[in-house]
């Protein structure tokens, strides 16, 4: 466990290995790891059960979230709660609560922007060479190369639109983050080690 609180916000291109790297960083530093759990915690805050998130993956795409929970709700509450802005605000509040409570790695969800005024937050963006990203997606989802390329393109498009809309910044632009890393250069574990060293040096841990 590290001395002093640190929050590591990680944005990533789909297929870059970001989830695995985020988990490695959390394990190496002995801190918490939050990904899709943020959505579940946000759901509880506004009275939804975890079953509402059964079909929601790591992509911050509330459009599908609406589809999944629409059948679970009825009455006038639906109109007031079922808005992107409301859900983004609730999720942002959950992110702030977690950051206040503990050191952790937070994957995506505009957490770098939500915590932009927290001087203990370091923001990262992970990319990888295209062939590496395609390979990972083919292996993970058991799809062919053409399908993998389509999934990568559509997922990154959604992530960029979501991030750009809520932050007013540009997703993946180096100016939006403290550090951008191409995972292909060092591999997943090498990248995790590099980031851990960067964090320790930045905060003099």
Task: Give, region by region, the residue ranges found by the protein language model.
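Pre-Walker A (Motif I) flank of P-loop NTPase domains
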Residues: 3-12, 102
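Glycine-rich phosphate-binding P-loop
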Residues: 10-23
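Conserved phosphate-donor/acceptor-positioning beta-strand/loop module used by diverse small-molecule
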Residues: 117-140, 145-153
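RNA pseudouridine synthases
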Residues: 98, 111-117
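ATP-dependent small-molecule kinase phosphotransfer cores
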Residues: 43-103
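Small-molecule kinase domains that catalyze NTP-dependent phosphoryl transfer to phosphate-bearing small molecules
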Residues: 63-68, 144-189
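Short beta-strand-centered segment that lines the nucleotide-binding/catalytic pocket of NTP-utilizing
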Residues: 32-43
